[in-house]
Amino acid sequence: MRRNNKKRIDLIHFILGGASMKRLIAMTIGISFLGLMAGNITFAAQFGTAAEAEAMVKKAVQLIKTEGKEKAFVEINNPKGKFVDRDLYIFVYDMSGKCVAHGFNSKMIGKDLIEMKDTDGKFFVKERIEIAKTKGKGWQDYKFTDPITKKIEQKSAYVERAEDLIVGCGVYKR
């Protein structure tokens, strides 16, 4: 048995070009670390960022201004369009809280959402309207059910006023 182990060690030593056990351990740790880092990068790339959400809103606002509401809403409502990216999507309300466009859930279009609350009782649609009316644009925090995990998660939304509309995009705080 001992002789077979020595042969295996000699074979490993030969394959690694004379590398010592310390070097072998260091290489194994290094390769493992790189694998973990690549996994974290892949995980992060699955989800949108706050900067991407804000940029998406600005593009949607620009489209509304240049192409008009009707053409813009067709693109915003397209689940395979440029306003849906991973877990990011655009939503649009009128100033009374009625949803007029939604990139992720077309069933929301036409619904009055003014009384919608998160799990803490926060009227987040009312808050979006207030931000749009008083500041023109801004961020808000609320809780929302993640459609992937089905769990209630912390979320932030960037909203911006475009004429008589509120254009927004939310990002989960992961």
Role assignments for model-derived ranges:
Residues 2-174:
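N-terminal membrane-sensor/transducer module of prokaryotic signaling receptors
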